[in-house]
Amino acid sequence: MDKFRVKGPTRLSGEVTISGAKNAALPILFAALLAEEPVELQNVPELKDIDTTIKLLNRLGTKVERNGSVFVDARDVNQYCAPYELVKTMRASIWALGPLVARFGQGQVSLPGGCAIGARPVDLHISGLEQLGAEIVLEEGYVKASVNGRLKGACIVMDKVSVGATVTIMTAATLAEGTTVIENAAREPEIEDTANFLNTLGAKITGAGTDHITIEGVERLGGGVYRVLPDRIETGTFLVAAAISGGKVVCRHAQPNTLDAVLAKLREAGADIAIGKDWVSLDMHGKRPKAVTLRTAPHPGFPTDMQAQFSLLNLVAEGAGMITETIFENRFMHIPELIRMGAHAEIESNTVLCHGVKKLSCAQVMATDLRASASLVLAGCIAEGVTVVDRIYHIDRGYEHIEDKLRGLGANIERVKSTGK
């Protein structure tokens, strides 16, 4: 497995170009299964999870080509099963189920894998599809869905706010007969982006980005061209990189209005923030950040995918800060690794109390999930000495060319290729 070797400490400063959002590109790629004409997707990041999704779409009979944009032609889909060998590394594969059963009347997806950060069950996906009229069977590790004719619109009240289940229900309802209303829907910008994509193809979705989404079912979707929105989590990660190192960064091709909760906490930490239509900058003027207290929450609250980065910020900040994780279990697995680098922290249940230290020391550390791996790489950038971050396949799932972008900010980082042994 590849590793990163990071030599610090470094003050990270400069400009970085933000990639397309992984968490929008994935549901949009799966939603392209609904289209009966070719689709061109722009600003799709080059990531392991995107590659896995393209392989999965190809397995189903979809023609997918990458040539700058990603071109998806789902006219000749002739397989309706997402097999275990492709699904096991990526939970997003469940998003194939809704489009398959909506357009073809059948679909089956192996129970998914992905990051080891809690249960994240698929029961809300299943319940939503059943309320649309699908028959669901769990058999031999697969979720199997079928329907005679078209799905039927329904009023669905989500028991719990779920990004994944909101996407599944919304995409399936696009081709359902009648009107579907999703109450207590997730409000993430990536859901709004997926709805905007579907509307480009001829869907009739209103309210995406709020907790009340209405979908007027249509008989078919055509083709179109769509540009994926910028990645707010990547943007936040590079802003934190500058904040923890006393640096200054300008994030270009960003969408600052998706980052309100993160920017508010960075200002609280003492950062000077400036924003434009498609850029955001942070300047620490060489100062240490101040510790902040926060709770993760569904959008528009503080995103769980920025929790690990802010844990690191608190661990090198002035003072002490408390972070409470309300979305996922087991999402403090990076903390013991940071403690090995000299951080002071105490975990109790779903809360971590961070006591800031002036400096971290190098160590060999192991990434456990996508966002935790980013925090360890950033820790290496500011720690004294050479830090080795193992299992970086996690980071390749969600950050496009992160070592190149960090080098552009002055980081001393290299990828050590696996020998294959």
Swiss-Prot record:
It is found in: Cytoplasm. Keywords: Cell cycle, Cell division, Cell shape, Cell wall biogenesis/degradation, Cytoplasm, Peptidoglycan synthesis, Pyruvate, Transferase. The keyword Transferase applies. The active site is at 115 (proton donor). Pathway: Cell wall biogenesis; peptidoglycan biosynthesis. Phosphoenolpyruvate binds at residues 22-23. The modification 2-(S-cysteinyl)pyruvic acid O-phosphothioketal is found at residue 115. The keyword Lipid metabolism does not apply. SUPFAM superfamilies: EPT/RTPC-like. InterPro entries: Enolpyruvate_Tfrase_dom, Enolpyruvate_Tfrase_sf, MurA_subfamily, RNA3'P_cycl/enolpyr_Trfase_a/b, UDP_GlcNAc_COvinyl_MurA. GO terms for cellular component: cytoplasm. UDP-N-acetyl-alpha-D-glucosamine binds at residues 91, 120-124, 160-163, 305, 327. HAMAP family: MurA. This is UDP-N-acetylglucosamine 1-carboxyvinyltransferase. It comes from Photorhabdus laumondii subsp. laumondii (strain DSM 15139 / CIP 105565 / TT01) (Photorhabdus luminescens subsp. laumondii).
